[in-house]
Amino acid sequence: MNKCGEMGKSENKGEPVMIIQFISVLLLGLILGIKHSLEPDHIIAVSTIVSKDKRLSRSTLAGAFWGIGHTATLFVFGILIVLLKGELADKWVMSLEFIVGIMLVYLGSKNLLFYTNRNVKQPTERTSLIKVTLIGIIHGLAGSAAMVLLTMSTVSTVWQCALYILVFGIGTIIGMLIFTTIIGIPFVYSSKSITTNKLLVRFAGSVSFAFGVYYMYSIGITDGLFKLWIK
């Protein structure tokens, strides 16, 4: 079977069969995209932003913009890797994942300190959307491309790869949009009570901070990233 980006001779299959097979691959990509968007490091990071939104529409937009940032990164770097027929060394892949851990700790810290000032400034919609888009970009850089390219071993041309990435990306947008809409409900309603909202915001921050520390330890120590850099 040809890998993505390689030009080989077509197998003796009828065109309708090949079209059906490709559509099946795209549908699988859509499902995998939805599933991928709901990975723990994704939903924890986005929750820290959504927890401070007072309108459900902003929570929904946050999920969409995370997916856009994630998809744009996958598309650009995924196609580049395909065209250059290259791959990142494990050290760099793990380093990008380690950055996600740092980001989670940072986002968690911001939430934990959010109510330390008496005059709390609600983040503007533009600020929130920029932040959540950057989070999506970082997640897109951190190993997702490798997983997508592995799945794309069933397609044979660059344009099919590009289409697959876009469909996969649409799946991540749909998945995160649904999640942020649902998770945004308790945060929006709790915004009427400072005490309740403070607890929820700090809870989201605590989870993000703790998971970020665990994530960095897992990659740096357990998976051996630090040893790779020392060599």
Which residues does each PLM region occupy?
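Transmembrane helix boundary and interhelical junction motifs in multipass membrane proteins
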Residues: 38-44, 141-150
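Membrane helix-loop-helix hairpins that form the core translocation module of multi-pass transporters
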Residues: 24, 28, 58-124
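Selective transmembrane alpha-helices of multi-pass membrane proteins
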Residues: 90-117, 194-231
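A small-residue-rich subset of transmembrane alpha-helices
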Residues: 57-87, 154-189
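Alpha-helical multi-pass membrane helix bundles of inner-membrane/thylakoid proteins
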Residues: 11-13, 110-141, 195, 223-231
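Divalent metal-coordination and catalytic microenvironments
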Residues: 39-42, 70, 105, 139, ...
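Short, Lys/Arg-enriched N-terminal segments with co-localized hydrophobic residues
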Residues: 1-17
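Small-residue-enriched transmembrane helix starts and helix-helix packing motifs
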Residues: 18-37, 59-64, 125-138, 160-169
